[in-house]
C-alpha cells in the first residue's frame, strides 16, 4: 500500500484518510466509499490509526463521482478508497458503479483494496453481478495462508475462511489481485508461510500476486513487540529464501509483481513461464549481496 497521499487537486473531494493505492494504480481515478479500516487490528499496520471507520453516504459518493471528470479527466479505471472499500455493502457498491457509468463513461473497471471478511456477507451471485457492473481485480490483502501467522498478527480470519472467500470469487468469475507479505511471520516462519500461502492460491482466479516485505513501523504493536524482544524479524537472506520457496510452490498461471520499495528488486513476470528465471535470480541475490547491504536497503525505505 502506498500513501497516504493527498494531492492538492483532489481537495474538493472527500479523502478522509488521504489516497492509498498500490504503485500500479497511479493512473487511476480515486473515489472514497469508506474511511479508515473496518478491522484496524493487524499488529504490523501503521495506517489509519487516527481515522475511525466510516461508510460514506451515497449523497457524498455521488457528489465526488461528479468531480472525477474535472479532476482526473477521462480515466479508464477507478480505484475505490480506503483501506477496505469492499466493506461497503452490496447495494452501495452497485449504486456507486451506476453513478460512475452515468457520470464518467470513460471508466472501464472499478477496483479497490479489500479484506477477506469484506466478502463474508456477499453471495457468489452478488459478486457476479458486481463483475457485470464493472468491478474487476479488487486487491485483497490476504498476507498469508498460514494459520499460525494469521493468528499471530491478528488478521482476523483463518486460512480456511480465506480459501472459502477466494473460492467464492473464483466461482463468480471475479479475478482478483492478491499479495504475499514477505517476512510477516518473523524469523523461523518463512518456509511454512511460503508453502501455505502458495497452497491457498492454488486453483484460484488470481490475476496478479504483488509481493512486499514486512518493515516494522514505529508506533505499531509489532514494532513494540520487537523492542521488547517478543518478536524477531526475519533476516534479509531468510526473506529471499522464503520468496524463492513461495515461487517454487506456486502453481497458478498469474503475474508476479515486485514493485514495492521494501523489496530489493523490481520485476514483473508471467508465471509459470518465467518462474525458474525468478528463482535463479533470487539465488544470485543470495549468493552475491551480503545480508548487511540488503538490510541497508530496507532501513532506507521505512514503510510497510
Question: What are the residue ranges of the model-derived segments?
Answer:
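Conserved strand-turn element in the central/C-terminal portion of the radical SAM core barrel
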Residues: 117, 141, 145-149, 169-193, ...
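Auxiliary Fe-S-binding modules of radical SAM enzymes
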Residues: 2-25, 104, 202-304
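Aromatic/hydrophobic pocket-lining residues that form the small-molecule binding cavity
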Residues: 61, 93, 123, 162, ...
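Catalytic cores of alpha/beta
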Residues: 125-127, 186-203
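Conserved, mostly hydrophobic/aromatic
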Residues: 37, 45, 61, 80, ...
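Conserved SAM/AdoMet-binding glycine-rich loop
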Residues: 69-172, 251
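Canonical Radical SAM [4Fe-4S] cluster-binding loop centered on the CxxxCxxC motif
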Residues: 16-60
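Hydrophobic faces of well-ordered beta-strands that scaffold small-molecule active sites
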Residues: 29-31, 76-78, 108-114, 138-140, ...
